[in-house]
From Swiss-Prot:
The modification N-acetylmethionine is found at residue 1. The modification Phosphoserine is found at residues 128, 130. Residues 11-57 form the G-patch domain. The gene is GPATCH4. This is G patch domain-containing protein 4.
């Protein structure tokens, strides 16, 4: 057990220091013989309004009601006669004589007689007192409860009863306990103690017993039904919970597989996109090279046939159109512009298709196949135009074919 040290004030510390200077140690008493006090006096605050010499335990030890009953019992005298018992109250004078104060004049001497000129005269009062002392002591008068109630005119120590607050229920319980205790002593079953005022007829008791017997099976049936309903509800709830858990597991597994498939497609799709882009770039390079070769061949053929010269003297709308249409330089420039525009548009379309294709290989493959088909068609068209541009084709035939293409 750890004892907390006392917190000392400045005054206590100063006093201890002064005593220690003069040879005092803790535990010694004050004085030359060291038999004085060992602890310092301490001032305490008085928190109440009681005077000096007040005993706080007096309210617990002072039995005022007992003194009151003793005083009233001392003032009563019970006389038994042939007619009956009679209670008589003593007057205040008699009570004063009985409890007279002792005479302290001759406290240490016994007065037997008075000296006179003729001689001693004995005291009559003393003789009477001696006669009274020689008699036997009288037994105390013990009063019963009924006598005390009559003497007190029905008043008791319970002050609340004067205002109508009685203890009938408590007294009834005590009486019932006494009856049960007496029944146990006699060897009978205590049962339910009943008062005379609350006694009931045997017919009513029989009816109550029958009602209880009839109610018991109904209550048991109801309790069984409630228990069965409760168990059914608990089973249903458990089944629902199991189903919910199973559905959640299935959905989680599906989501996991879908995510894994998406990741795999992303990985494979990225590789497919790279391959498709490389393949498309190669095809476009080949197309450009082929177009360039075809243009060079056509220019060489035109130069060889016409000698690179055009008649300037011929004037007219038809001849001018023919010259422009049949002029190899004009043709080659326009073709190059058209081809470059077509190639640029194809590049843009391919890039958009690759971006939109996302992460799936099937879409990218289908898009690349479609673009290949388009590029093949355009190649055929270019070849046909080159054939038409040749020296053996008329301008009328070329115009008709162009109109048909526009309609298509």
């Amino acid at each position: 057990m750890s004892i907390t040290p006392e917190v000392k004030s400045r005054g206590m510390k100063f006093a201890e220091e002064q005593l220690l200077k003069h040879g005092w140690t803790q535990g010694k008493g004050l004085g030359r013989k060291e038999n004085g006090i060992t602890q310092a006096l301490r001032v305490t605050l008085k928190q109440d309004t009681y005077g000096v010499g007040h005993d706080p335990a007096k309210e617990f030890t002072n039995h005022w009601w007992n003194d009151l009953f003793n005083k009233t019992a001392a003032n009563l005298v019970v006389e038994t006669r042939q007619d009956g018992v009679q209670i008589r109250r003593l007057s205040k004078e008699t009570t004063r004589q009985d409890h007279a104060k002792p005479n302290l004049l001759y406290q240490k001497f016994v007065k037997t007689a008075t000296l006179t000129s003729s001689g001693e005269k004995p005291d009559k009062d003393w003789e009477s007192c001696s006669d009274d002392d020689s008699q036997e002591p009288k037994p105390p008068n013990v009063l019963t409860d009924e006598m005390l109630l009559q003497a007190c005119e029905g008043r008791t120590a319970h002050k609340a009863a004067r205002l109508g607050i009685t203890m009938k229920a408590k007294l009834a319980r005590l009486e019932a306990q006494e009856q049960a205790f007496l029944a146990q002593l006699k060897g009978q079953d205590p049962g339910v103690p009943q008062l005379q005022s609350e006694s009931k007829s045997p017919k009513k008791k029989k009816k109550k017993r029958k009602q209880k017997e009839e109610e018991e099976p109904t209550t048991t049936e109801r309790s069984a039904e409630k228990y069965s309903e409760h168990t059914d509800e608990s089973i249903r709830k458990s089944k629902k919970k199991k189903r919910q858990h199973q559905e959640e597991r299935v959905t989680d597994e599906r989501e996991g597989t879908a995510i894994e498939n998406e990741e795999e497609t992303i990985r494979t799709g990225g590789l497919g996109e790279l391959k498709n882009r490389e393949h498309v770039d190669r095809s476009f390079r080949k197309k450009k090279r082929r177009g360039q070769h075809h243009e060079e061949r056509a220019e060489l053929a035109v130069l060889d046939n016409e000698g690179g010269k055009v008649a300037v003297s011929e004037v007219g709308t038809e001849e001018a159109e023919r010259r422009v249409y049949t002029h190899p330089c004009g043709r080659s420039k326009k073709r190059r512009q058209h081809e470059e525009e077509d190639l640029n548009t194809e590049d843009e379309e391919v890039e958009e298709a690759l971006v939109d294709s996302g992460t799936r290989e099937a879409e990218s493959r289908s898009c690349s196949d479609q673009k290949r088909g388009r590029s093949k068609k355009k190649r055929r068209q270019y070849q046909e135009e080159e054939v038409l541009d040749g020296p053996g084709v008329n301008t009328a035939q070329k115009a008709k074919k162009k109109k048909q293409k526009k309609r298509d």
